[in-house]
Amino acid sequence: MVLIRVLANLLILQLSYAQKSSELVFGGRPCNINEHRSLVVLFNSSGFLCGGTLINQDWVVTAAHCDSENFQLLFGVHSKKILNEDEQTRDPKEKFFCPNRKNDDEVDKDIMLIKLDSSVSNSTHIAPLSLPSSPPSVGSVCRIMGWGKTIPTKEIYPDVPHCANINILDHAVCRAAYSWRTVANTTLCAGILQGGKDTCHADSGGPLICNGQVQGIVSWGGHPCGQPREPGVYTKVLDYNDWVQSIIAGNTEATCPP
């Protein structure tokens, strides 16, 4: 059963996250407070919805299936219980989706570009991450991060984001794991073949970081997460670079790859 990684756990003054289909980083360790400066939280009155990535001071990229009404974006967060002095909150001014996205497939062209209502200032805990300049090769070690589940079968979410290293896998691995549905060419297959490390509930929309660039967006994967030979499927950001750059430049009629 495939899970789309988005969340809905309560915020209760502490914010609780979303799942791969909103999932959490399973098998990871608490991130260093300075290693997730580009990581963004999408949240509303119910709690954390998804992750996202700051790509410049005015724009965030996340998963299209993370779209929700009345959400805000939070920058510079580490602990749900202890505020960083440089945390910043913004509203979405505009949201952009691929115009050729299939309405009946929640994870088709699973990318959403968000223009902020005002610029975010770089600070100790806030900085953008570069878009990819070239694709990651099979075997590359990449970083995942988020406030998703740390135990796949239990509603347990961490106070600080967890991080883990996983590998880029051949697309054939994901196609074999999920033979009952299409694994698009515009995605990346990533995980650990033996299982044990994966994005999970509440991690949707967050980054797959390879060589210091946002190469992927958490989209979907196996359920429960972290199972052997059931890696995660990530939107391949490189394939959407032209669309992203066109939208940022003001060409709102730009289309995405088929």
From Swiss-Prot:
Disulfide bonds join 31-163, 50-66, 98-256, 142-210, 174-189, 200-225. SUPFAM superfamilies: Trypsin-like serine proteases. It is an enzyme of class 3 (hydrolase). Inhibited by PMSF at 2 mM concentration but not by EDTA. It is found in: Secreted. One of its GO terms (molecular function) is serine-type endopeptidase activity. Gene3D superfamilies: Trypsin-like serine proteases (2.40.10.10). Its EC number is 3.4.21.-. Residues 1-18 form the signal peptide. It holds the Pfam family Trypsin. GO terms for biological process: proteolysis. Glycans are attached at residues 44, 122, 185. Residues 25-249 form the Peptidase S1 domain. Expressed by the venom gland. InterPro entries: Peptidase_S1_PA, Peptidase_S1_PA_chymotrypsin, Peptidase_S1A, Trypsin_dom, TRYPSIN_HIS. Snake venom serine protease that may act in the hemostasis system of the prey. Has weak fibrinogen clotting activity. Belongs to the peptidase S1 family. Snake venom subfamily. Negative results: does not activate nor degrade plasminogen or prothrombin (F2). Does not activate factor XIII. This is Snake venom serine protease 2. It comes from Protobothrops jerdonii (Jerdon's pitviper).
